Amino acid sequence: MVATGLFVGLNKGHVVTKREQPPRPNNRKGKTSKRTIFIRNLIKEVAGQAPYEKRITELLKVGKDKRALKVAKRKLGTHKRAKRKREEMSSVLRKMRSGGAGASEKKK
């Protein structure tokens, strides 16, 4: 309801400008910070892949997407997490192929 300055009717009341409230801290709950993302990527780069992640990539290489999803679901617990992991591993595989193809051509 927007006040019109009239003292009768549905929109009665004094006209005021609404103050902009600062965002509440609970609105950023669950959102990963830039620093955390950077650190996680660094750790992934240094530590490499877990054995189950290697298995998923092997399954994706031979085109067994459904089996890869099942392996991921078994390890991670939920279908949603498994789908995200499968997509992550397939994107890693895609990057390796595109990066690897360029590197092998340069060697020749």
Swiss-Prot record:
Key words of the record: Ribonucleoprotein, Ribosomal protein
GO cellular component, one term: cytosolic large ribosomal subunit
Region Disordered, residue ranges: 13-34, 75-108
Keyword Protein biosynthesis: no
ATP-binding in keyword set: no
GO biological process: one example: translation
InterPro entries assigned to the protein according to its UniProt record, in alphabetical order: Ribosomal_eL36, Ribosomal_eL36_sf
Biased amino acid composition, Basic residues: 75-84
Gene Ontology terms, MF aspect: mRNA binding; structural constituent of ribosome
Pfam families in alphabetical order: Ribosomal_L36e
Superkingdom field: Eukaryota
Annotated family: Belongs to the eukaryotic ribosomal protein eL36 family.
Protein name: Large ribosomal subunit protein eL36x
Protein species of origin: Arabidopsis thaliana (Mouse-ear cress)
